[in-house]
Amino acid sequence: PTISFFRILPFPSIALMKSQDHGREFFAALDIGTDKVLCIVARPGAEPGSMRVIGMGNARSSGVQEGCVVDVQEAVQSIRKAVQEAQYTAEVQLSGVWAAIGGKYLQSANCVGQTVLRGQEVSREDVEQAESNARLAAMREGKGSTVIKLIPQGFRCGDVMTARPIGLVGPKLEAYVHALYGSKTNADNLKRCIQRAGVEVINYEPHPWAAAQAVLSETEKTCGAAVIDIGAQTTSIIVMAEGRVQFTDVRPWGAEIFTRDLAMVLGISLEEAEELKRNSGECRLSQVIAGEVVQFESHGALSRLYSRDLLVKTLAARAQEYFHLYRQLLIDARAFDHVELVVLTGGGAMLPGIADAAAAEMGKRVRIGPVSYTHLTLPTT
């Protein structure tokens, strides 16, 4: 099946395990967001590289702010509920999961390591030495942060950029990696919460990388695409082109800023504004009829009428500013020209009209990115 979740899960990087009772292979992933905690269990599908979901659990997230654990007890309860529900629906017992990690402390850097060839052909030992030096460079660049993932970007030998340098001749061999860093404190706290919920952390996958693997085809990764994952309190962006990561960034703002704008403009609570946004939100001014009103009733209170024109204008103005910031971010990072397509995902991408707002402000093709399991690569571990 092809399923669109409230948040995109890191399916390509989840862990292969054996069901204790039936001896079947299955996969488990855990995504702990500010708004929701989701746990997915899947099994290899009939087609090579595809997966079939056999169980899912979700819970309202508590104890997490901007992707970071702030209350261990509440976070553990949310994780435990999602994991137990996933185990029940899948009829399996999980011992470990791959966990997506993000938050405002996630950072990235492009790093290079090299080795001198002295005119000789590139050997396997040269490749390993260049890769080792690239890893050391990434650790130095992190300045004390934990390296979450190193993504190989290829090799350069002389004027040639390649994925397979063995046998080439040149003065030196350079290995390029894209490093993603996270807060060691947050990673440790997240691990403890997951363990207290009853499962082990097999490994972490950065949210931006996981989202890109889940929503982009191989063609899109080659031609150039930016994935903007709009969470509740954070937004991540990753640019892939020529099959490589060009840029990654996480900002401490998300879909909640739209909610806060509505609350301030309409003079209502954040809870009421969130409900109003979910039920009647829209970013396209063309969808407003003159004099149209929205009838809103919250928790049994007397219904109230709000101007739909004011509601839509508020959300449209925020969307315009939001995507203007990301356009400028990509320009400043010299990544804008690599992008042919923008893919929106995460809970914030469900706001009606947001894709049109992004296209108008960024000047790129835009689509909403549900997971398509047909192009995912199953893990080998």
Predicted regions: what is each one?
Residues 318-327:
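A general structural motif
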Residues 3-36, 40-226, 244-246, 255, ...:
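Nucleotide/phosphate-binding catalytic cleft detector across ATP-hydrolyzing
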Residues 223-265:
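Glycine-rich phosphate-binding loop of actin/hexokinase-like ATP-binding domains
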Residues 374-380:
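Conserved small/polar residues in nucleotide/adenosyl-binding loops
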Residues 328-341, 345-346, 368:
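Hydrophobic alpha-helical bundle architecture
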Residues 35, 281-284, 338-361:
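Glycine-rich phosphate-binding loops at beta-strand->alpha-helix junctions
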Residues 197, 361-362:
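Short, structured coil segments at secondary-structure junctions
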Residues 39, 99, 194, 229, ...:
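Residue-level signature of catalytic and energy-coupling elements of molecular machines
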